[in-house]
Amino acid sequence: MARYTGPVCRLCRREGMKLFLKGDRCYTGKCAIDRRAYAPGQHGQSRGKKPTEYGIQLREKQKVRRIYGVQEKQFRSYYDKANRQKGIVGENLLRLLERRLDNVVFQLGFATSRPEARQLVRHGHFTINGRRVDIPSFLVRVGDVVGVKEASKSSPRLKEILSSLDRTPPKWMSLDANAATGTIIALPDREDIQLPIQEHLIVEKYSR
């Protein structure tokens, strides 16, 4: 499945919630879902059909995929890995997604959205333990230090972001704003993931 390249605001309207795909715009009155809180398309306002159980499960899976910017094949791979781990499958799945480098970069405040974080990672602006990593899906581990590459600190976009760095990261990571680094101090717990996700619906879908 090809990566979606269309208007991302349509995705938020389709899922009926903010997915925070456009950075700062999502926090302003320009956010599309604030102005048009209904599904996109000609019949978006008139869709009154009650969704099926499968439809509800599918929408939840699509919502999580879109939040983290993961394609179907890779998402299924995460699910299979989560299913092999000990513990609750749905929570294992969310932990894997949270550990992605692009998500960590976003949570540390080095990008205003996950899509922007993914792009910055791909362009080689970040290091892990001093070594450049340009793979957005790289899974961080406890003890890893994620930092902005020294040469990248003077790039216009990162310079702008770092000059107003004020995000408070989740408790499983610590931020050193002066050094532009973040340290993974623990693996994320379910309560650390402040997203309206019902992961059990995803498990039910894949268990059909």
UniProtKB/Swiss-Prot annotation:
Pfam families tied to this protein: Ribosomal_S4, S4
Database matches in SUPFAM superfamilies: Alpha-L RNA-binding motif (SSF55174)
Organism: Desulfitobacterium hafniense (strain DSM 10664 / DCB-2)
PANTHER family: 30S 40S RIBOSOMAL PROTEIN, SMALL RIBOSOMAL SUBUNIT PROTEIN US4M
Record's subunit section: Part of the 30S ribosomal subunit. Contacts protein S5. The interaction surface between S4 and S5 is involved in control of translational fidelity.
GO terms (BP aspect): ribosomal small subunit biogenesis; translation
NCBIfam families named in the record: PRK05327.1, rpsD_bact
Family note: Belongs to the universal ribosomal protein uS4 family.
Keyword rRNA-binding: yes
GO molecular function terms attached to this record: rRNA binding; structural constituent of ribosome
Gene Ontology cellular component annotations, sorted alphabetically: small ribosomal subunit
Boundaries of every S4 RNA-binding domain copy: 99-165
Function: One of the primary rRNA binding proteins, it binds directly to 16S rRNA where it nucleates assembly of the body of the 30S subunit.
Name the record gives this protein: Small ribosomal subunit protein uS4
Residues spanning the signal sequence: none
Keywords: Ribonucleoprotein, Ribosomal protein, RNA-binding, rRNA-binding
